[in-house]
């Protein structure tokens, strides 16, 4: 029985804390923080600290991802990607079936120190191509950190449709 009571105490405290948060806020606005409000602030600070720990450690949470734009025009599609610091020998563009693959898979050793630290600047984009893309005439260019891929469009003849009767 004592073990089950220990399990319920944190749950009960959380319920009391959440149900009385408005009451604690009233005194907090006047500059007189209640013990309940102090506990709520402590919990908020700890959650913020945990969020900051992961945000600073995982670049996934940062806005370091490659920015891209897809533009549709009458005669072509245009893909524009920001890839600052890359040169054309580091980026590979391939077409396979109806997929366009844009990749960079190179590890760079950190030259600033003698440790075995590597910087990973890899990326891998797979784009499904529309059926009206002229795959034989896709072109690309890289200038000032901007990768531009031109996907020419061809006219697709509509196949003769046949109506199916419902029995």
Swiss-Prot record:
Keywords: Stress response. Gene3D superfamilies: 2.60.40.790. PROSITE patterns: SHSP. Residues 59-167 form the sHSP domain. Disulfide bonds: none annotated. Pfam families: HSP20 (PF00011). The keyword Zinc does not apply. Belongs to the small heat shock protein (HSP20) family. This is Small heat shock protein C1. It comes from Rickettsia felis (strain ATCC VR-1525 / URRWXCal2).
